[in-house]
């Protein structure tokens, strides 16, 4: 595409300690009302005008300050995780560190990045609904713990025994998308495992709050203080989105068709 050709033409492959730093994020974009497109159309309420809403998913090079990929979705069908895996899978970049916020926390996303040969650094939830909640972690404000977690969607009696070791085994239900395990299996089919390698890192950011990060960066090369610094760099994509939408006038698009955005 023209976008990808342009990105490659200005690509200087600037690296941070030998790694290309990419951030991924999403942002909504209003376009002119088009009621013929129900997947993005929102009728006006309380005197407001009707509009159509798109969701832009983008991958941004934090050192070169350029977008290296983007995927536009209609708002009612938006799926940031699907957009992330699509951009990772189709990328021609051989090695990169992908930084992302909590909305991208999923085993499937981590698996796609790992299988690409990239590294990831993603802020994750501290509560009961995320990856960290299923692991036995230190009850401290600061730690750095490695994991080699085997995922399976099988639930035989033997597997249930293995799952008691929750720092080494995890069951993935068939309702959760995971592209590296068979979607269906018969009762007597052998169990299939997919192994994820990562660290869970936690550190305080104030007297009352902590951040929790999942990453597969090598601990000896990137200790905890480097993880703090790298995560702070992720905010560069927030600034770039703000500049794109306000400074460059992306808030005032007149196209009614997604293809023209």
Label the predicted regions.
Residues 13:
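P-loop NTPase switch module centered on the Walker A-proximal segment
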């Amino acid at each position: 595409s023209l976008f990808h050709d342009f990105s490659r033409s200005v690509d200087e492959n600037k690296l941070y300690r030998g790694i290309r730093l990419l951030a991924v994020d999403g942002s909504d974009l209003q376009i002119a009302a088009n009621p013929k497109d129900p997947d993005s159309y929102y009728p006006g309420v309380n005197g407001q005008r009707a509009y159509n809403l798109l969701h832009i998913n983008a991958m941004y090079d934090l050192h070169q300050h350029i977008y290296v990929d983007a995927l536009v979705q209609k708002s009612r069908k938006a799926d940031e995780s699907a957009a992330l895996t699509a951009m990772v899978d189709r990328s021609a970049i051989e090695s990169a560190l992908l930084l992302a916020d909590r909305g991208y926390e999923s085993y499937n996303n981590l698996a796609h990045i790992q299988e690409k040969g990239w590294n990831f650094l993603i802020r994750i939830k501290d509560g009961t609904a995320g990856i960290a909640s299923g692991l036995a972690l230190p009850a401290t404000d600061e730690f750095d713990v490695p994991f080699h977690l085997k995922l399976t969607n099988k639930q035989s009696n033997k597997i249930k025994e293995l799952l008691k070791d929750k720092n080494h085994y995890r069951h993935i239900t068939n309702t959760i998308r995971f592209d590296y395990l068979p979607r269906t299996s018969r009762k007597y089919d052998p169990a299939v495992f997919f192994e994820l390698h990562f660290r869970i890192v936690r550190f305080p950011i104030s007297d009352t709050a902590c951040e929790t990060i999942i990453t597969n960066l090598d601990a000896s090369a990137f200790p905890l203080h480097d993880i703090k610094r790298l995560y702070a760099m992720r905010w560069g994509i927030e600034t770039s989105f703000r500049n794109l939408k306000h400074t460059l006038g992306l808030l005032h698009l007149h196209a009614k068709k997604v293809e023209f955005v």
